[in-house]
Amino acid sequence: YSFAPIRYFRRVEPISGKIRIIGRESIRHQIYDYVCGTALMPLFRAKVGRWQTASIPGRGIADARRAIKQRVREPSSRVFGKLDVRKCYPSISREVLKRLLTRDVGDKRLLDLTFHLIDQYAGDDGLNIGSYLSQWLANYYLSYAYHYCEQHLSKERVNRRTGEITARRLITHVLFYMDDILLIGRSKRDLTIAVKRIRDYLHDELRLEIHPTWNMKHVGAEPIDMVGFTFWPDHTGVRAGIFLRARRSFRR
């Protein structure tokens, strides 16, 4: 397989001000990306979690918005933590990604093509922001963290009278919007334990880091700011930066 080099350029996000390095692939490269992504789709559909919503057809912002709007009103939703994976796309370990794909993909020709496409990206690690295949691979990679949250964020409790051991979830809800992670729980103590575990899992298993400035807040005391909206128990608003940008565009 032969492709023209990927052309990279910088783009400043209008709301966050973050600088993104975007890769523009040749038409031939994009075709192979699409063919490979289509062939891998049964795997992606099986692995990507229900509440991973970014870049998933039929989900996206609208799906995340509906879910958060509903969950923020539940009596069990008392505290929340919003985590951000630092430089997610550039930090994805290709070694780990290839190991996961080797385990999950049985077709050697498809695996070889996937590895070849991954190796076209600049640097030794990371995926290409702007690539059709990369957005699916990123969701696939993070699905391991999502399922860890769903299946392993619990603690055991022993009944002193009967000795019976029961498991209780540390969180009530989890939602991934690509590298933004929302955890909702009943207590600050449980949520703190949950955050430590997912942070350790990301570091140890996926070689990713959580941004150190994450914090925990009480639902209703402050809004959940995610996917461009601010969520309160009794109403949902538009993030201020998006509203101001839309107003400026309208005035033009």
Model regions and ranges:
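Short Gly/Ser/Thr- and Asp/Glu-enriched loop/turn motifs at secondary-structure junctions
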Residues: 4-6, 175-179, 213
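Short, conserved non-catalytic motifs in the polymerase core
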Residues: 5-33, 47-59, 118-140, 163-166
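Active-site-proximal segment of RNA-dependent polymerases
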Residues: 33-93
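Conserved polymerase palm-domain catalytic core
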Residues: 70-178, 182-200, 217-223
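A common structural junction motif
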Residues: 199-208
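Short acidic, Pro/Gly- and aromatic-enriched capping/linker segments at domain boundaries
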Residues: 209-223, 234-237
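Active-site and adjacent loop segments of nucleotide-processing enzymes
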Residues: 225-252
